[in-house]
């Protein structure tokens, strides 16, 4: 049944949901990649759709908003109230290393964070916020499409405008390729409620070089990561 934030019914969502931050990007993904897509949520403008990919697989796509608090609400409700088993975040990140280029795809197998949300979940202990191994493996295998992607830890920040830029030097030292705002929270929610999750990001801006993409491009393109996400679902179904 409907929740305070999702006006759908059980069965409206597929067991796999792709989740961009921007609900308009969710609409673009549904229009571009899914057949017979229908709207299943519009509460607060957080659009959600369910359709079929390549005539073979029912898949849903829905926005999750910005930051861990927002994405945690939506992912929790999808899992506990609508039977969703797998979440794939498809979003943007900022690069912190010179060798990472604009529009590259980064598969986040783990997520460091300055947020305290997972400590609240885990009785004030550190929780290893990691993606499901099988989902990571299939995303890597989906690179056979000819799409280049890199795999690394990423960093989920609570603040978009950080007051301490020296933290980027620490991230670079530890091999982190990108900064975003949600993955650690999504991995925590998935672990708490027995689901699986993965984050795939496209580099939308570069913290070192100050290069950036424009909002319209982020909304309607970045299709390589979407292809990896969708094809990884088909690979999973073959197991």
UniProtKB/Swiss-Prot annotation:
GO biological process terms on file: purine nucleoside catabolic process
EC class (word): transferase
Active site, renumbered: 205
One GO term describing the cellular component: cytosol
Keyword tags: Glycosyltransferase, Transferase
EC number: 2.4.2.1
Name of one Pfam family that matches: PNP_UDP_1
Position of the signal peptide: none
Catalytic activity: a purine D-ribonucleoside + phosphate = a purine nucleobase + alpha-D-ribose 1-phosphate; a purine 2'-deoxy-D-ribonucleoside + phosphate = a purine nucleobase + 2-deoxy-alpha-D-ribose 1-phosphate
Disulfide bonds: none
Positions of a purine D-ribonucleoside binding: 5, 180-182, 204-205
Annotated phosphate binding sites: 21, 25, 44, 89-92
CDD domains found in the cross-reference section: PNP_EcPNPI-like
Gene Ontology MF: a single term: purine-nucleoside phosphorylase activity
Site note Important for catalytic activity, residues: 218
The keyword rRNA processing is assigned to this record: no
PANTHER family according to UniProt: PURINE NUCLEOSIDE PHOSPHORYLASE DEOD-TYPE, URIDINE PHOSPHORYLASE
Family that this chain belongs to: Belongs to the PNP/UDP phosphorylase family.
Quaternary state and interactors: Homohexamer; trimer of homodimers.
Protein task: Catalyzes the reversible phosphorolytic breakdown of the N-glycosidic bond in the beta-(deoxy)ribonucleoside molecules, with the formation of the corresponding free purine bases and pentose-1-phosphate.
Name the UniProt record assigns to this protein: Purine nucleoside phosphorylase DeoD-type
Higher taxonomy: Bacteria, Pseudomonadati, Pseudomonadota, Gammaproteobacteria, Enterobacterales
């Amino acid at each position: 049944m409907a929740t305070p934030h999702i006006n759908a019914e059980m069965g409206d969502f597929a067991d796999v949901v792709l989740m961009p931050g921007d609900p308009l990007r969710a609409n673009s993904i549904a229009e571009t990649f899914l057949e017979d897509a229908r709207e299943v949520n519009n509460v607060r403008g957080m659009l959600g759709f369910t359709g079929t990919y390549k005539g073979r697989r029912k898949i849903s796509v829905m926005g999750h908003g910005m930051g861990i608090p927002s994405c945690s609400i939506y992912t929790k409700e999808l899992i506990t109230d609508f039977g969703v088993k797998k979440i794939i975040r498809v979003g943007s990140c900022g690069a912190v290393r010179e060798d990472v280029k604009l529009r590259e795809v980064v598969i986040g197998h783990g997520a460091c964070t300055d947020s305290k949300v997972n400590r609240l979940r885990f009785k004030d202990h550190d929780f290893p916020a990691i993606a499901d191994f099988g989902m990571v493996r299939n995303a890597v295998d989906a690179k056979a499409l000819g799409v280049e992607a890199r795999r690394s830890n990423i960093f989920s920040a609570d603040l978009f405008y950080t007051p301490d830029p020296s933290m980027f030097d620490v991230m670079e030292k530890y091999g982190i390729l990108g900064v975003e705002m949600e993955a650690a929270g999504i991995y925590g929610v998935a672990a708490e409620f027995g689901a699986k999750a993965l984050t795939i990001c496209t580099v939308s801006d570069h913290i070192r070089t100050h290069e950036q993409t424009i909002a319209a491009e982020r909304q309607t393109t970045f299709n390589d990561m979407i292809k990896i996400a969708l094809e990884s679902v088909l690979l999973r179904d073959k197991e």
